[in-house]
From Swiss-Prot:
Residues 1-11 have a biased composition (Gly residues). It is a multi-pass membrane protein. One of its GO terms (molecular function) is potassium ion transmembrane transporter activity. The gene is kup1. This is Probable potassium transport system protein Kup 1. Residues 1-38 are annotated as: Disordered. It is found in: Cell inner membrane.
Length: 661
């Protein structure tokens, strides 16, 4: 698959994500501090499980705020009669069981890439060369994964808006006077949330787990109290009620299923955040706390509706005693902020992975914690999300309006994940197609049914995440193909490094004191920046370093495998530095490591040479003209290599070059 190389340099397109990765257990947070048989010590496991409550389960944990409400009081609501209430509860129970407990907890979390999860980690497990997978299948898998990643951005725009709105809508239950305050309050909370991102969340993040623990305990208690008063609601455990619901409502039942899907939004976060906490703590927190708390609250809302159908306008807050309404609104608002924070941090992480894998241009990546590699802030993404999230609140003005847009992205991503999982299981792990197809087919039956039910709400807001995904896929595909075209140009116009070194050895080239570091997109060709430097200045430095950054198909690269150095003669050294797709390369740190290990001589001063490309979209490239112009625009506005690679600006020399493509 062409074009799969990092924006700042890397391997040729044909070799990217190409090596076969055997499925094996790697270090992950759950076994860093281990007891017997690799199981974490009890204290460590409980600490990770508590942390997972705050990061992994914020989204799905706040779904009770709006799921039942949307079924019985939304745009396509049904009457809150006993048969419908029991049918909806049965659908919620079995959706959580089949999709979250079985698909994600039991199967998807086995597909870890050295402990990491998520769509890009899953894609990186698929072999991209050889006879294990056909060329057409590779193209389908890559495009599916890119679409899945793009859909996550659409989901990321909606989650903060709908969770914050639904939380503070409890004020309407307390007093009618609060109705006009909902939108301004939601906008103010979102504005504050995005403005504090640049300061990092390491300190405040420590309270996320305890707050969500209180949240789950509270919603479970509220639900249990109602169930005790009306235990008949427990009969909805039987799937017969779900069957009767569809038998009675037919197509309208599918529309309501699109609202039931809101109960599983956030389920994909279990897999995506696996690298932060490990599969054992995530499973523990799900089965010990989250799953039972959600079921108790949903069934409690159902029990309350059986007693008072007029609570349908906001059944969640209908469970709360009036004297506790304001404290509950405050707790729900904190839970919604935590859910939003998890989504924002996930968008930052996803963007960094996409940059490293060469799917989007370089962006500004700020590390907000000296201790934690994953604590990052990306101002470009933060500004975009802030504008879109506040815009959604101003346009839709209520959680019920946004509910139509929510779910489409999640269910489409779930279906895509199932497809990629099939290729990982059959091509990487060696599972037989005959055994894998029925399992994945079962997943897809649920995924496609949920996705289809949400498409029925296309004109009620479902178009929004799909439009966002389409734009992002176009950007990623154009950037990938554009970088591939530039690589072809470099291959055609640059001599091999061996040829250049032969010329240097034959001529008495004047050398100046110091070290010159040239960034090279491939280790076999002469960097264009070196060619232009030598062409115009007619000199070389005493020591010349050719530095290539390789991004691997693994999340991280061990320090011992980071740097490979080769002495080329004539004062030239080649350094190949390998990074995982969840890491950010820092060139001065690479050089310091090489100096400390005495792999290259340290000759001062050090200058860094970069190529500054001016793209002219009028060349022979096969890309469509509008895609060429888009690629040129993205290239002009991408983060500079100086900032992205952490280079000291006073030591950087940029050499311009025009490229027609």
């Amino acid at each position: 698959m062409k074009g799969l190389f990092p924006a700042g340099g890397g391997n040729p397109p044909s070799s990217y994500l190409s090596r076969f990765l055997p499925h094996r257990k790697e270090r992950s947070p759950e076994n860093v501090t281990s007891g017997r048989n690799g199981v974490p010590h009890r204290g460590r496991m409980l600490s990770l499980a508590l942390g997972a409550l705050g990061i992994v389960y914020g989204d799905i944990g706040t779904s009770p705020l709006y799921t039942i409400k949307e079924c019985f009081h939304g745009t396509h609501a049904i009457a809150p009669n006993p048969a419908n209430i029991m049918g909806v509860l049965s659908l919620i129970l079995w959706s959580l069981t089949m999709v979250v407990s079985i698909k994600y907890i039991t199967f998807m979390m086995r597909a870890d890439n050295r402990g990491e999860g998520g769509i890009f980690a899953l894609l990186a497990l698929v072999p991209m060369s050889g006879k294990l997978i056909s060329r057409g299948a590779r193209a389908v898998v890559v495009m599916a994964a890119l679409t899945g990643a793009a859909l996550l951005y659409g989901d990321g725009f909606i989650t903060p808006s709908i969770t914050v709105l639904s939380a503070i809508e409890g004020l309407e239950v307390a007093t009618d006077a609060a109705k006009n305050l909902i939108v301004p309050l939601a906008c103010g909370i979102l504005l504050g949330l995005f403005l504090v991102q640049s300061r990092g969340t390491a300190k405040i993040g420590r309270i996320f787990g305890p707050v969500m623990l209180v949240w789950f305990a509270t919603i479970a208690t509220l639900g249990l109290l109602c169930i005790v008063r009306n235990p008949v609601v427990l009969d909805a455990v039987s799937p017969v009620y779900a069957y009767r619901f569809f038998a009675e409502h037919h197509v309208h039942g599918l529309v309501v299923l699109g609202s039931v899907v809101l109960s599983i939004t956030g389920g994909e976060a279990l897999y995506a955040d696996m690298g932060h906490f490990g599969r054992v703590p995530i499973r523990l927190s799900w089965f010990a706390m989250v799953f039972p708390s959600l079921l108790l609250n949903y069934f409690g809302q159902g029990a309350a509706l059986l007693e008072q159908p007029d609570l349908a306008f906001n059944p969640f807050y209908g469970l709360v005693p009036r004297v506790l309404l304001l404290p509950m609104v405050a707790l729900a608002t904190m839970a919604s902020i935590i859910a939003s924070q998890a989504m924002i941090s996930g968008a930052f992480s996803l963007t960094r992975q996409a940059v490293q894998l060469g799917y989007i241009p370089r962006v500004t990546i700020v590390h907000t914690s000296a201790e934690t590699e994953g604590q990052i802030y990306i101002p470009e993404v933060n500004r975009l999300m802030m504008v879109v999230c506040i815009g959604l609140v101003l346009v839709f003005r209520a959680s019920s309006g946004l509910a139509g847009a929510y779910g489409v992205a999640v269910t489409a991503n779930m279906a895509i994940t199932s497809v990629v999982y099939f290729f990982v299981a059959t091509r990487t792990w060696g599972w037989s197609t005959a055994k894998t197809a029925p399992l994945v087919g079962l997943f897809l039956v649920f995924d496609i049914t949920y996705f289809g039910s949400n498409l029925l709400k296309f004109f009620d807001g479902g178009w929004f995440p799909l439009a966002v995904a389409l734009v992002i896929v176009i950007v990623m595909a154009s950037w990938k193909d554009g970088r591939a075209e530039l690589y072809k140009h470099i291959v055609k116009s640059s001599p091999t490094l061996d040829m250049f070194l032969e010329d240097v050895s034959r001529h008495n080239v004047h050398r100046v004191a110091g070290t010159a570091v040239f960034m090279a997109s491939t280790s076999s060709l002469t960097p264009p920046s070196l060619m232009h430097h030598f062409k115009h200045n007619k000199v070389l430095h005493e020591e010349v370093i050719l530095l290539t950054i390789e991004v691997t198909h693994t999340p991280q690269v061990p320090a011992a495998e980071r740097i490979r150095v080769e002495e080329l003669g004539e004062g030239f050294h080649r350094i190949v530095a390998r990074f995982g797709f969840m890491e950010t390369p820092n060139v001065p740190q690479i050089m310091d490591s090489a100096y400390r290990a005495r792999l290259v001589p340290q000759v001062l001063p050090v200058s860094y040479y970069l190529g500054r490309e001016t793209l002219i979209p009028s060349g022979p490239s096969r890309m469509m003209p509008w895609r060429k112009r888009l690629f040129a625009f993205l290239s002009r506005n991408s983060q500079s290599a100086t900032n992205y690679f952490g280079l000291p600006p006073g030591q950087v020399v940029e050499l311009g070059v025009q490229i027609e493509f």
